[in-house]
């Protein structure tokens, strides 16, 4: 789907149905309002395989040989709508996502979900704010979110790793495997026991 234009959903406008992409391209389309590539307000939007949704714009001008100006607006998600990653995304292009709501200092915005082996944050790009990278938050399913992280200065740990937690989305930052290589100190000199992140 290429070279189309509309007020909303220059390439595809899904209002009350499902959209399933297991490959194919939605490229170089334009919308005057939202969703240069896809405007999705339907029931489910599943993606997998070699999907390419890129080069779509909002407010661009068609030159006959392409689009000039405008802003990146590949997939537009109104409040509460997300993409489901139904299988591995094998394409080389990131899927750009623009959301109606935006993250703030107390709230993240979810853009996608799927199992941990398929929902990879590097396959997506958040278009509302290029400084915000898409992050993965693990649970029964993996959520891909746009978040203005507020990382704790304290360490959280399990049996194998330690990391810092975001107070907003509860995501992990800089997980590090325990090494247990702290210098051994005589018991009489210890203020407290050594851990994997601090010496005795």
Tell what function each PLM region has.
Residues 21, 48-51, 138-139, 165-169:
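Short, solvent-exposed coil/turn segments at beta-strand boundaries
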Residues 48-50, 56, 62-150:
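Extracellular/surface-exposed low-complexity segments
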Residues 6-8, 31-36, 41-43, 159-163, ...:
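Short, solvent-exposed linear patches
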Residues 7, 33, 55-63, 95-100, ...:
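Short, tandemly repeated low-complexity microdomains enriched for cysteine and small residues
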Residues 23, 147-200:
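Thrombospondin type-1
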Residues 5-14, 30-39, 61-80:
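Extracellular beta-strand/beta-solenoid scaffold signature
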Residues 1-3, 18-30, 46-55, 86-89:
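Right-handed parallel beta-helix
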């Amino acid at each position: 789907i290429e070279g189309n234009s509309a007020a909303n959903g220059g390439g595809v406008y899904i209002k009350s149905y499902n959209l399933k992409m297991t490959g194919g391209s939605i490229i170089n389309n334009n919308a005057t309002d939202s969703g240069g590539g896809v405007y999705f307000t339907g029931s489910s939007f599943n993606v997998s395989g070699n999907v390419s949704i890129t080069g779509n714009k909002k407010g661009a001008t068609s030159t006959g040989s392409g689009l000039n100006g405008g802003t990146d607006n590949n997939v537009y998600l109104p409040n509460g709508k997300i993409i489901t990653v139904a299988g591995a995304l094998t394409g080389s292009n990131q899927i750009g996502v623009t959301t109606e709501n935006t993250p703030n200092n107390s709230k993240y915005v979810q853009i996608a979900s799927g199992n941990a082996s398929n929902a990879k944050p590097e396959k997506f790009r958040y278009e509302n704010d290029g400084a915000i990278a898409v992050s993965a938050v693990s649970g029964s399913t993996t959520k891909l979110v746009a978040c203005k992280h507020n990382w704790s200065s304290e360490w959280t740990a399990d049996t194998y790793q330690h990391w810092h937690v975001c107070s907003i989305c509860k995501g992990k930052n800089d997980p590090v495997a325990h090494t247990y290589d702290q210098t051994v100190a005589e018991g009489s000199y210890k203020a407290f026991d050594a851990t994997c992140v601090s010496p005795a």
